[in-house]
Design a protein with these regions (language model features):
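A C-terminal cap/extension of S-adenosyl-L-methionine-dependent methyltransferases
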Residues: 179-180, 185-258
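Conserved class I S-adenosyl-L-methionine
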Residues: 144-173
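Conserved N-terminal segment of class I S-adenosyl-L-methionine
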Residues: 1-109, 113, 117, 130, ...
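A short glycine-rich, Lys/Arg-flanked "PGG" loop and its adjoining helix->strand segment in the class I
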Residues: 127-142
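Short catalytic micro-motifs in class I SAM-dependent methyltransferases
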Residues: 118-122
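A short hydrophobic/small-residue beta-strand
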Residues: 70, 143-144
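Short aromatic-enriched loop/helix-cap "lid" or pocket-rim segments at secondary-structure transitions
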Residues: 59, 154-159, 222-227
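Conserved catalytic-core motifs of eukaryotic protein kinase domains, centered on the activation segment
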Residues: 125-126, 156
């Protein structure tokens, strides 16, 4: 991965869909992220947070508007500038720097929380990047990780094609270049389609002492379906059932504690 200063088509598509979304429309997503982190750790004004891959910057901006401390790192100069404009329109500095997670020095034991919200699918050397994240977390620090799930029937990366994530990498790349142009390989391509089993193993190998998945994080108080509640109870009792259910989820979601 490299930082590209020229205009890229995937960034333009992203901005055309998301740049004008009001911050108020992201409040539910913001609260859900805080809820997931809060499942394993408290958050207050002294909590040092970093978001990798900020997009339009809505999460760090909402943090600052709510008295929380969150820096951001984004590889796209266009998106950094977009976040700056949105922050200024709300009277704050978005606090987002241009950087490449594959190369950036995140420091040693600097952060209480690091958020990687649908970004690692785009990180070519993702294992090296995860090691940097692990080193940058303080003891008992928290990583919130959300990304692709290879065996999802519909992938958010390319929803037009069912079973897109099941395709071998070279074929996926060709499909995306056919529809979105060759510069998708500069920024926007999903180099990685993850699985729950594979990520769980990777997080534990890195040294995370606690790895919590989407089943654990489910907001059970808001689930009305008896079938869904029953399925969650089965997942609690059987690791086999849990892995079978998670296999086809649309995304992978983990909260990991160092």
């Amino acid at each position: 991965m490299q930082i590209h200063h020229e205009s890229l088509s995937d960034v333009e598509r992203y901005l055309s869909k998301r740049e004008k979304i009001p911050l108020a429309h992201k409040e539910e997503d913001f609260r859900n992220i805080l809820r997931c982190i809060g499942f394993v750790s408290g958050i207050d004004g002294s909590t040092e947070m970093l978001e990798i891959g900020t997009g339009t910057g809505w999460f760090p901006i909402l943090c600052r508007l709510n008295g929380l401390s969150c820096k951001g790192m984004e590889i796209s100069p266009q998106l950094v500038e977009c976040a700056r404009r949105i922050g200024e329109s709300h009277g704050i500095d978005a606090g987002i720097e241009l950087g490449n997670i594959e190369q950036a020095d995140l420091g040693h034991e600097q952060y209480d929380v690091i958020i990687a919200n649908f970004v690692f699918e785009h990180v070519q050397d993702w294992r090296q990047a995860l090691r940097r994240v692990y080193e940058a977390l303080k003891p008992n620090g928290v990583l919130l990780f959300q990304s692709t799930n290879k065996f999802s029937v519909i992938s958010g990366e390319f929803a037009k094609m069912p079973f897109y994530g099941w395709l071998p990498n070279p074929i996926r790349y060709r499909v995306r270049m056919l529809f979105h142009g060759r510069d998708i390989m500069k920024l926007g391509i999903d180099f990685n389609q993850f699985t729950y089993l594979g990520l769980r193993k990777t997080f534990k190998t890195l040294g995370f002492r606690r790895v919590v998945d989407r089943v654990d994080l489910a907001d059970r108080s808001s689930i009305e379906s008896a079938i869904k509640r029953g399925t969650l109870r089965l997942c609690d009792r059987s690791q086999f059932v849990r892995e079978a259910v998670l296999l086809f989820f649309e995304v992978t979601t983990f909260v990991c504690v160092k």
